[in-house]
A protein has these predicted regions:
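Catalytic core segments in nucleotide and nucleic-acid processing enzymes
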Residues: 1-121
Length: 121
């Protein structure tokens, strides 16, 4: 059985190597940080695609600087593998309950997320 993350960045032509693997989660990151099961799943993806970088994308209620959390895992003596979580801010309120305002705020959050993701890759 083959396993695949949600996104692969820099996938080689033979599909055996990716510069980075990215996986989206639909549950918010809790105060404890990286979930153990999510970490194991990401490590499996990273080993499958011989990648040193893994990114877990989480929804985030608050637009703050804590949306980026890094944790490094050294699996081999000569190879530094890391997993980094990146929060995508989901607006929780809309001005006067207007859908258009939510869409505008969500577009800003998406643009900020894309910028932070590009900075990581």
């Amino acid at each position: 059985r083959t396993i695949y993350p949600d996104f692969l960045w820099g996938l080689s032509e033979d599909k055996f190597y990716a510069k980075a693997v990215l996986d989206a989660k639909y549950k918010p990151l809790d105060d404890k940080g990286l979930d153990r099961n999510d970490a194991y799943q990401m490590l499996a993806y990273m080993l499958r695609f011989d990648s040193k970088r893994g990114y877990l994308i989480y929804p985030q209620k608050y637009n703050d600087k804590n949306g980026l959390y890094s944790k490094k895992y050294d699996l081999y003596r000569d190879r530094n593998i890391f997993i980094q979580t990146i929060g995508l801010h989901i607006p929780q309120t809309a001005k006067e309950g207007k859908y258009e305002h939510f869409c505008s705020e969500m577009q800003k959050a998406e643009e900020d997320f894309i910028k932070r993701l590009r900075d990581c890759l």
